[in-house]
A protein has these predicted regions:
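Alpha-helical adaptor scaffolds
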Residues: 220-225, 235, 239-290
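Register position in tetratricopeptide repeats
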Residues: 258-259, 293, 323-327
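TPR/TPR-like (Sel1-like) alpha-helical repeat modules
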Residues: 292, 297-315, 322
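N-terminal nucleophile
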Residues: 6-223
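Charged, low-complexity interaction regions
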Residues: 226-228, 313-314
């Protein structure tokens, strides 16, 4: 069996400091993310494309878990498939070691680039320059979070001509151990544009909000030195954003101040949220939390009393007021 044709361009990449690993792909097919990307946040990732053998994804991850190198894995995959020259596959382990194979029966232009920390591969491309521009964009944005670097790489590919047939779907998946929503799983970012006339633009639009609604909150929850630069980058990005909602500012402010990190930024964001939604008692509670975390108990009390004035029967606000009064009297 030849399997389905998934001509595409992809990047597999890892951040060896934060321990994030991800894949981004775009193609003129429906739902490129359905078959191409396979990721295990503890071991590595596999991208299987062209005349895709989807078995390579699961088997590749199993072999990574067993400690095989990316080259050894591709050699094993080759030995198991009589139609291997139709395939294109890339493997990257969590340490940034990668390897790729492009069969000589792939539709041109087809090729790959491998280096420490990333594997870039594509087939049915307008030219070799598509891959070169992907690499250039990825390397020139090293100060940004991995997900954003992957998206910028895909955008560069599209600008360089991308898939010769056109565009339809894109996917970006980034995993980090316990980096998913509330730590339930590992999906830090999972954005799928399955059928669109402008998949890159849609991907960027959704990511713009995703990075604050989900990714930054996960970074804050996991908060450690390895993630600090990403947290600072995203907080600064939020400061200059002009179209975020009150909820976005409030959610981040609460996470920061309840964990006693970057409390000054948290206070700034909570006040922005209040300006956007001045009668929201929950935002007033967040402002109080930020003042409390900064040791300004009188202002915390002031904002809690404002919140209670709006929701006069709120027992939570009443208990918080008594708590803050106790701190003032200590």
């Amino acid at each position: 069996m030849i399997y389905f044709l998934f001509s595409t361009f992809s990047i597999i990449a890892t951040d060896t400091i934060t321990k994030e690993i991800g894949i981004g792909s775009c193609s003129k097919v429906l739902g490129v993310g359905f078959l191409v990307p396979w990721i295990d946040p503890e071991y590595g990732a596999v991208a299987t494309q062209s005349f895709v053998n989807v078995k390579f994804g699961k088997l590749g991850l199993e072999l990574l878990k067993l400690g095989y190198s990316p080259k050894e894995i591709i050699d094993i995959l080759k030995s198991s498939d009589s139609l291997f020259e139709l395939r294109q596959v890339g493997v990257l382990n969590i340490n940034g070691d990668g390897y790729a194979f492009t069969g000589n029966k792939n539709f041109p232009y087809a090729g790959h680039i491998t280096s420490k920390g990333y594997v870039i591969l594509g087939n049915l491309l307008k030219s070799e320059n598509v891959l070169k521009e992907m690499e250039k964009a990825f390397l020139s944005n090293i100060n940004k979070p991995l997900a954003e670097r992957i998206i910028l790489s895909l955008e560069a590919a599209e600008k360089a001509g991308g898939d010769r047939r056109g565009k339809q779907s894109c996917v970006v998946i980034v995993k980090l151990k316990n980096g998913g929503f509330e730590g339930i799983d590992d999906r830090l970012v999972e954005i799928r544009i399955d059928d669109s006339k402008q998949p890159i633009e849609d991907l960027k639009r959704i990511y713009k909000n995703w990075q604050y609604e989900y990714m930054l909150i996960s970074y804050i929850r996991l908060s450690n030195k390895n993630l600090e630069s990403n947290i600072k980058y995203l907080l600064q990005s939020m400061k200059v954003s002009k179209d975020l909602s009150a909820d976005s500012y409030n959610n981040i402010a609460w996470e920061l101040c309840s964990r006693n990190i970057f409390q000054e930024v948290g206070l700034e964001f909570s006040l922005k949220a209040n300006k956007l939604s001045p009668k929201d008692a929950n935002i007033m509670d967040t402002i109080a939390k930020c003042y409390e975390s900064l040791g300004n108990y009188k202002e915390a009390l002031n904002w809690l009393e404002k919140a209670l004035n709006i929701e006069k029967n709120n027992n939570y606000f009443k208990s918080r007021i008594e708590q803050i009064k106790g701190l003032i009297n200590e």
